[in-house]
């Protein structure tokens, strides 16, 4: 049997979408970018598209309401969906001394920030007021 990640890689490579009926989610690789995405339930997705990101924002998993988009071990952006409409966004460059957080109740803005970060579109940081996150040495 194949893992979800293996199936997502295969369907991406052939240009096919994959529907997960348990999570009511369509993984559509059209117009994707190659980044690593980790969903709150542990699902590893080897790409991101605007359609997939929109679906993740429209229907976050209520049990594990977050996602991480990663370029490298200490270079990522993540969102945590709070009750109501609020979204906490955190991003890190290089290490714990470069970890920042912001909160918005505008989910479309949060989605746009994650997409612009993932596509390296300039200006995404100016959309919110970021606060440095103090993280202990063991993190």
Spans of model-derived segments:
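Acidic, proline/glycine-rich low-complexity IDRs
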Residues: 2-139
């Amino acid at each position: 049997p194949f893992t979800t990640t293996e199936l997502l890689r295969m369907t991406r490579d052939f240009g096919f979408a994959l529907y997960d009926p348990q999570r009511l989610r369509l993984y559509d690789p059209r117009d994707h970018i190659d980044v690593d995405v980790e969903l709150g339930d542990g699902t590893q997705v080897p790409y991101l598209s605007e359609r997939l990101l929109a679906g993740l924002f429209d229907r976050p998993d209520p049990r594990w309401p977050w996602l991480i988009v990663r370029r490298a071990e200490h270079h990522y952006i993540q969102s945590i969906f709070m009750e109501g409409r609020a979204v906490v966004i955190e991003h890190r460059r290089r290490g714990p001394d470069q970890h920042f957080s912001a909160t918005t109740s505008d989910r479309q803005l949060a989605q746009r920030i994650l997409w612009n970060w993932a596509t390296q579109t300039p200006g995404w940081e100016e959309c919110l007021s970021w606060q440095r996150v103090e993280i202990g040495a063991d993190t």
